[in-house]
């Protein structure tokens, strides 16, 4: 009898120890210690947007171009945003990338500015996620990413016609006049009212070629092309959508340095659904797995860094 009672006591103690170990192994959110806005001011040349560790996508806002100030495409001291491109250099001190600039907007489709002031106090960024409100258009923008795909979610708040500018000519350059010449060759095809595919060959810091697939979760109801300037090879497309106030459009962009098929496979493998929250969570998990290698008990942290 005593032996049986002893067995149950040992079993209970082991169970308590097991539960305490499980509780102590609850994953810590290391992303909360990271502040992507560090280095965004003069001339830190960092970007606040979304990416995953060692990914080829860095989807982020652009606030200016054509000078050394904008090697990463963004300066937090600026008051307006021109759009959101799919890849960026970080802290390099040289301009390049900034491929496929996308801007959601509303109202008159022939908008001469194609930029908006933004609410800095509501701007958010943590590893794998970025959000901002374009105050002139009343559009909330959210960005996340996988290794080879970017995902955008645009929520249109105003009761005005909803549009998206897809600028395939844009890129981060040293001088504004290079915006017309840095694209050496370009091909683009509209597959249907949901998909755009193509390739660009560009030369800024180096000559390179990339292939893309752009997909929308809602069909565009109309499309226009902006008049190209002399020397430009790629197109700027204006897409219109039939939305009610509060509805959103999601955009996915797959990139490849090999082929359009490679960009499509990236979407199929890494981002097959229209589940923004799932991709956002997976991106945060990828960062947490990497950041967990750091022993925070040895560091006194008062602010995100």
Model-flagged regions — what are they?
Residues 2-10:
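Bacterial N-terminal signal peptides that target proteins for export
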Residues 10-18:
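Bacterial N-terminal signal peptides
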Residues 2-3, 21, 179:
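Short, intrinsically disordered low-complexity segments
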């Amino acid at each position: 009898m005593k032996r049986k009672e002893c067995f149950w006591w040992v079993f209970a103690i082991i169970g308590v120890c097991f539960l305490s170990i499980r509780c102590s192994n609850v994953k810590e959110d290391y992303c909360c210690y990271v502040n992507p806005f560090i280095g965004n001011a003069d001339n830190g040349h960092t970007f606040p947007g979304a990416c995953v560790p060692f990914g080829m996508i860095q989807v982020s806002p652009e606030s200016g171009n054509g000078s050394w100030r904008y090697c990463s495409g963004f300066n937090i001291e600026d008051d307006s945003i021109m759009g959101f491109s799919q890849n960026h250099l970080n802290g390099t001190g040289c301009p390049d990338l900034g491929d496929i600039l996308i801007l959601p907007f509303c109202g008159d489709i022939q908008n001469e500015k194609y930029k908006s002031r933004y609410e800095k106090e509501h701007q958010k960024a943590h590893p794998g996620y970025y959000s901002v409100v374009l105050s002139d258009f009343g559009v909330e923008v959210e960005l996340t990413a996988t290794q080879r795909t970017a995902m955008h979610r645009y929520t249109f708040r105003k009761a005005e016609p909803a549009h998206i500018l897809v600028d395939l000519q844009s890129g981060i350059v040293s001088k504004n006049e290079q915006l017309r010449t840095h694209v050496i060759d370009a091909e683009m095809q509209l597959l249907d009212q949901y998909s755009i595919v193509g390739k660009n060959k560009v030369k800024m810091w180096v000559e390179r070629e990339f292939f893309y697939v752009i997909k929308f979760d809602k069909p565009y109801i109309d499309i226009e092309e902006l008049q190209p300037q002399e020397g430009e090879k790629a197109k700027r497309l204006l897409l219109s959508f039939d939305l009610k106030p509060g509805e959103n459009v999601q955009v996915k962009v797959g990139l490849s340095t090999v082929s359009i098929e490679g960009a499509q496979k990236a979407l199929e493998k890494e981002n097959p659904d229209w589940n923004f929250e799932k991709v956002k969570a997976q991106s945060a998990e990828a960062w947490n797995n990497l950041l967990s290698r750091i022993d925070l008990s040895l560091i006194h942290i008062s602010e995100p860094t």
